[in-house]
């Protein structure tokens, strides 16, 4: 069977425990990687995506016990919480991420204070605005207008899913939400939910997420979102307020520099 077909089937069985990010992004990221499967009685029980430096995907059917070997050449591994104990990760730093899912069947009503309003990003003229909002919301992330333009060239791009929240009095955008929709497997994903620091704790983030979910409800069968567990803004709490569910934890493991 074609590897990508197997990948999609396994992903749709449980999107949050099979990949830490949306499937389309994982497929793009691993173009050129080595892809392997092991089967028992024509049933896939083990799946690996790797290259010389990185173990991107490791999945094992819970009915089987296979003990993998960490290659000395790995400088990075991505492992679900279910599998991390199978690996010796003593020489790796560990950054934890959550991944949650929404069934899009029970989307809460959008409640936004009348001081604010939603509008769609103008892709022709507001790439700089998009990058500026993102940069103002992070101390460790810098996104250029050129990078934002590249996002619009992906097959999952849908301009109607790029949404700004505007302060009606100041007539200025104060929050940004970007979602994507993979029509191949009917997956929606939230990629950027950013509220300027001075406008946080007013419920704007919840309103923005619910607004995007209502848009995705007409396009997708489910929606996913990922984020860092130790983020000071606690995005997981925001998404759970909007009925995202799940308990999947992913580990982004990077080999300590003195071990290279």
Name each region found by the language model.
Residues 1-24, 111-143:
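Short amphipathic alpha-helix that is part of the acyltransferase structural core
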Residues 8, 14, 18-71, 174-197:
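Conserved donor-binding loop and adjoining core beta-sheet/short helix segment
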Residues 44-115, 251-255:
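Acyl-donor-binding surface of acyltransferase catalytic domains
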Residues 49-51, 140-195:
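A conserved beta-strand-loop-helix scaffold within acyl/acetyltransferase catalytic domains
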Residues 62-71, 192-197, 201-217, 236-241:
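Conserved acetyl-CoA-binding loop-helix of GNAT-fold acetyltransferases
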Residues 71-81, 216-228:
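Conserved GNAT acetyl-CoA-binding A-motif
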Residues 84-89, 235-240, 244:
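Conserved active-site tyrosine of GNAT-family acetyltransferases
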